Amino acid sequence: MAKTLGDHLLNTLEELLPYDFEKFKFKLQNTSLEKGHSKIPRGHMQMARPVKLASLLITYYGEEYAVRLTLQILRATNQRQLAEELRKATGTEHLIEENRVGGSVQSSVENKAKSVKVPDVPEGDGTQQNNDESDTLPSSQAEVGKGPQKKSLTKRKDQRGPESLDSQTKPWTRSTAPLYRRTQGTQSPGDKESTASAQLRRNVSSAGRLQGLYNNAPGRRESKKAEVYVYLPSGKKRPRSLEITTYSREGEPPNSEVLPTQEETRNGSLIRMRTATLNGRTTGALEKGTGIPEHSMVLDEKTFRNMSSKTSLIGEERCPTSWTENGNGSPETTESSGETAGSILSDPEVPLSLCEKPAKTPEDPASLGQAACEGRSQDKAVCPLCHTQEGDLRGDTCVQSSCSCSIAPGDPKASGRCSICFQCQGLLARKSCEAQSPQSLPQCPRHMKQVLLLFCEDHREPICLICRLSLEHQGHRVRPIEEAALEYKEQIREQLERLREMRGYVEEHRLQGDKKTDDFLKQTEIQKQKISCPLEKLYQLLEKQEQLFVTWLQELSQTISKVRETYYTRVSLLDEMIEELEAKQDQPEWDLMQDIGITLHRAKMMSASELLDTPPGVKEKLHLLYQKSKSVEKNMQCFSEMLSSEMAFSASDVAKWEGRQPSATQVQGLVPTVHLKCDGAHTQDCDVVFYPEREAGGSEPKDYLHPQPAQDTPELHEIHSRNNKRKFKSFLKWKPSFSRTDWRLRTCCYRDLDQAAAHPNLIFSMI
């Protein structure tokens, strides 16, 4: 998962040492903020740890401004490497804002010079080699590893004056100021002679610092390992990793070590080194093809005698170098991992690794140096463990969590080799004692400086020794907190095992329940299909019956229309006959007597029965249609009522689902609707009105008509179904269409809700 700005901010704060972290909080309180931002209350920051402080920064200022503010404070407190790492981690899009917020506080990497120029030896002293010496060291060209070109191309002039000899001899310093940019200038030979050794040491220190930066040196924590120091005759300290073994002309061993030089071409793409030995002195010159005059540096023989036989200019990466003899007996170097032996780094843009190994001397792990961290002043000495500078606020306080020196205090072999490690180890031993002191353990809130060493079983809380003697815990079961913790851990383990077993049991039953649920769902789907198919068929049947019934009604309407047209035709013929006889009556005698017999015959043939006669078949069709419509109406009503009652659940069904027996009131209270199906052919003889019994404790149903009292009410019969759970009464009323003496009750069939057997031949006697 990608890290956010808050994650990078928290990682940076966690990498700060305790003293640096307190210094960071102090600087944060005194830093001016942008408009619209308020300072974090001092009470919140006093006891805040990195996690709490990161959350306060994000809460008060937001992620982006919190990162910019952190970069500003880190640079102000000389934590340049952490600031650079945070800037790279948060991306380059904040670079412009960082420069605007930080103001004059800029990264040390951006302020470093394009190259390190070492003053060359004057032409009269070091540019000419001694012709009497035949074993002059050959110059070799070092391969320069291609590092990331992240340095600024601009060079800035240093505002400080020349460094003193003491400040130049401080090795592995963390510089906060940009490197010097050498300009053209003249210097007397005497001054050059006196400061040559110091200048070489200072430039070698700068080269080693840049080497660690450009060769992917480890992080800040790894760069704080111990550095082995040696004392020079002048009383100054020097890291052993910066020592270069040199020999005079008389005492030079057969396999003399080479100090190669690099010379850059005029286009600035190649750097070379060259070394010359003149009059028992070794002069290392760095030349750069820019046309700018360069100063010289001379190392005297006395200084070289006090140096060790090894040199390491990179922090933790060792460059194994194997030496082979060529045909002339001079040493040759075999380069490994793109690094070449050398003594001085001439260009910070192109890192150079130098690892020298004597032919007959085994490697000593203590001689491997650690690359100094960037961000401190170049002219001040730094403790290899705690990185404390001279004049720092901490003084002699060592804040390193562990000492990386392998030499224990009091070791006779350590005399003259690593004196500063004794001080660090003493401070670390004191810090170890403080870590094991009672103050690091939880203290009693009631009794100050009393550690909670006991545990009260009755109150289930940790207590101190004074609490144990108090009246509150008198007579209670008290044990050491370690024993109680072991017992409770065992109880927690047992509960975890029990809960895990329970979880497995529940999971197993859940799987079984899921299987049963799937079966129920399948059965439900099957029942749905079983019900849907008959209902669909019934719906299709009803549609066909509806079409048939509508067709019959249309035919009947057409028949009635024909009867009416026939009646109108006969009436019109009668009117014509009347008009013809009236006209015949007003004619003269001679005209009247013509066709008089035919006219009278036609008049006599007209009769009322012929005019009012209905066409044959119409009456039968009307009667049959009436019967069918009445039957359909009754059957549809019965079917709808029966379907509604079948879909309703009784109290006994609900009680059966809940696993209990229904009460008598519930059984008698829910009486389903009773249905009676009559033959459609006899609907004219009698009309049956059927009413359900009133529900117990409820009102009479409103969906049915009230019983209509009849003159001759038949006897009341109670009918019970097979399961003897339903009881109902029926009231029947007849509407005879003929004489009372001919009343007859046709055979009717009763059908119960639960498909009980039909009860035919229910004959009701009349009073």
UniProtKB/Swiss-Prot annotation:
Phosphoserine modifications at: 241
Segments forming domain Pyrin: 1-92
SUPFAM superfamilies linked: B-box zinc-binding domain (SSF57845), DEATH domain (SSF47986)
Record comment regarding domains: The B box-type zinc finger interacts, possibly intramolecularly, with the pyrin domain; this may be an autoinhibitory mechanism released by PSTPIP1 binding.
Zinc finger region(s), B box-type: 439-481
Pfam families: PYRIN (PF02758), zf-B_box (PF00643)
Residue ranges, annotated region (Required for homotrimerization and induction of pyroptosomes): 489-647
Post-translational modification: Phosphorylation at Ser-241 is required for the interaction with 14-3-3 proteins and down-regulation of pyrin pro-inflammatory activity. Degraded along with the delivery of its substrates to autolysosomal compartments (at protein level).
Protein name: Pyrin
Tissue: Expressed in spleen peripheral blood granulocytes. Not expressed in lymphocytes, thymus, testis, ovary, heart, brain, lung, liver, kidney and muscle.
Residue ranges of the region described as Disordered: 94-219, 311-346, 697-719
Keywords: Actin-binding, Cell projection, Coiled coil, Cytoplasm, Cytoplasmic vesicle, Cytoskeleton, Immunity, Inflammatory response, Innate immunity, Metal-binding, Microtubule, Nucleus, Phosphoprotein, Zinc, Zinc-finger
GO cellular component, one term: microtubule
Coiled-coil blocks: 481-510
Keyword field contains Zinc: yes
Record text on subunit structure and interactions: Homotrimer. Interacts (via the B box-type zinc finger) with PSTPIP1. Interacts (via the B30.2/SPRY domain) with several components of the inflammasome complex, including CASP1 p20 and p10 subunits, CASP5, PYCARD, NLRP1, NLRP2 and NLRP3, as well as with unprocessed IL1B; this interaction may lead to autophagic degradation of these proteins. Component of the AIM2 PANoptosome complex, a multiprotein complex that drives inflammatory cell death (PANoptosis). Interacts with NFKBIA and RELA. Interacts weakly with VASP and ACTR3.
GO molecular function: actin binding; zinc ion binding
